């Protein structure tokens, strides 16, 4: 098995910063330093994850073929388990209408977004000016408090420029 050490190092750093950021979130009101560190991490960490996801999505056919198995099914499973967990903690009765497939709980939005981006990438890649167009769409979402689906659609559109930027990025560009 060939391991790309730079990829592993970059992902490890981002995951470490994400965990650190979530830890800092609990204490940011108690310390100015922690609040500043929290803000520094949150300025770029999701954008970097999305950019890397786009960068590692060069094979558009494979992306579409594996999107359901790699992203949608885990999303459904973990979103449902999160729904069960929240219902258990809150003592809420389970109901068919309580679980909403397209309303991701917490961080599940990222799996849902990856599924959408991977499914749409082959079509997006055919659009000549997709990067500037995605930037305009991303900025446009800022004009609305929500596009629906509990902010999932807003996040999908607003992070699309980073995904497409990663997809279009070539190492020779550095």
Tell where the protein language model's regions lie, with residue ranges.
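Membrane-interface helix-boundary signature
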Residues: 3-7, 11, 35-38, 65, ...
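Functionally critical transmembrane alpha-helices in membrane proteins and complexes, commonly lining
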Residues: 5-59, 71-80
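Membrane-interface starts of transmembrane alpha-helices
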Residues: 6-13, 126-137, 150
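Interfacial loop-to-helix transition and helix-capping segments at the boundaries
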Residues: 34-46, 97-112, 145-162
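Hydrophobic cores of alpha-helical transmembrane segments in multi-pass inner/ER membrane proteins
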Residues: 46-56, 109-121, 159-167
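Structural signal for the C-terminal ends of transmembrane alpha-helices
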Residues: 54-62, 119-127, 143-144, 165-174
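Membrane-interface alpha-helices at helix entry/exit sites of multi-pass transporters
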Residues: 63-71
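Membrane-interface helix-loop-helix regions
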Residues: 70-123, 131-147
């Amino acid at each position: 098995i060939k391991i790309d050490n730079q990829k592993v190092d970059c992902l490890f750093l981002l995951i470490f910063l994400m965990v650190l950021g979530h830890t800092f979130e609990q204490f940011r009101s108690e310390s100015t330093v922690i609040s500043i560190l929290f803000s520094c991490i949150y300025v770029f960490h999701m954008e970097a994850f999305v950019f890397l996801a786009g960068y590692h999505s060069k094979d558009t056919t494979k992306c579409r073929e594996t999107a359901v198995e790699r992203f949608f099914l885990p999303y459904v499973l973990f979103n449902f388990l999160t729904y069960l967990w929240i219902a258990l903690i809150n003592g809420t009765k389970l109901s068919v209408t309580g679980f909403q497939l397209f309303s991701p709980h917490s961080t599940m939005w990222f799996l849902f977004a990856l599924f959408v981006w991977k499914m749409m990438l082959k079509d997006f890649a055919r659009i000549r000016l997709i990067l500037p167009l995605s930037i305009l769409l991303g900025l446009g979402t800022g004009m609305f408090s929500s596009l629906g689906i509990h902010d999932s659609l807003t996040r999908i559109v607003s992070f699309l420029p980073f995904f497409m930027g990663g997809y279009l990025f070539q190492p020779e560009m550095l």
